[in-house]
Amino acid sequence: MTIEISVNKEDFFDLTGLRLIDNRFRLLEEVSGGKSSTGFFGIDELTGKSIFVKLSIFPRSELEAARFRNEARFLKEQEWANSIIKKTPSYISHGELFQGKILYLVTEKIEGQLLSDWLIKNFYKASLTERLLIAYRVFGAAEHFGQFTTHHDLHPGNIMLLDEDVDLHTDVPDYKVIILDWGQSHSKLEASYAEESDDIAIIHNGMGREITASFYNLPPETFMDRNRAGSEYNKYDSWAMGLLLYKLITGNNLFNFDNIGQFAEAMRHIEMDIEYQVKNIDKYAEKKSLILQGLLYHLLVKEPRERMFIQIARHVLWLILVEEFEPDDVGMVARFLRDPLGFKEVNWKYFESDPLARIY
């Protein structure tokens, strides 16, 4: 006779002691759950501050565990960068329980509104300028290639908007946006110097072997040979930003994929689909149509080495917002987008107010 004992989720956390981690971090409310992790809001009983706790319970593979540990390492290393421009949640702690069967990561709890929620509640109330300001802020926060890291899963559910005003003329821009969930992030540079047993090397060797990120954001190079010379892995996230910009302009998704087969089929005619959809944004963008069409074409290029960097696209959005750059000449748009930072045909009023343009 077989006796089955049913243990529900609440009992599991109580029985394992996961309600209080490290005698400090108390889990209060489950807020998210994905294929490889579960998230909780809680409280740090040492400081009394609200926290976010991410758990990986019985990782299904060494690759999954490596991704989790790599996210913790990346966030821990952001302390200095966040002191200048805050873009990621502040790291508090991470570790493992039960000989690595459960991994945990503790960060601050970010108070704000997910971009996915903002789109549902505010898209049709917001003007195009207000939506482009959101795009500018997100582009600024999403660019991490200066640290040789790409996020690999940028979508509205991983982007938190802070309820604070943004100064477009400050010497040190703060985009008031926090990018969440770095579990898919990768640095090819770090991988090239890593030992085979290092987490970043395990992640690099596993690229393309399993897909756990959103189908919608996958760029055409998802299944390319990651070791081939000249791979522009640093522009992986630019594709996702192109899709987001299109959504912020039109309110629509450029593509709809339910499975990997649909994604693979779409790649056969992706360039024609993009050209057709982008050409029709004029009813949403009006006087800004030409410049926004050009920007979308430069972000949504199938060949990654020809794709625009996020930080350059951010600068283009800044010029549209601050300089009110709305050219009505196709040739001027083409010349401008070939070199936005060096474009000399316009006398800018405020260009030097964007200090990052000098760096990039």
Residues covered by each model-derived region:
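Protein kinase catalytic-loop region centered on the HRD/HxD motif
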Residues: G140-T149
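Short beta-strand micro-motifs within the conserved protein kinase catalytic domain, predominantly
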Residues: K87-L103
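Activation segment/activation loop of eukaryotic-type protein kinase catalytic domains
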Residues: L162-A213
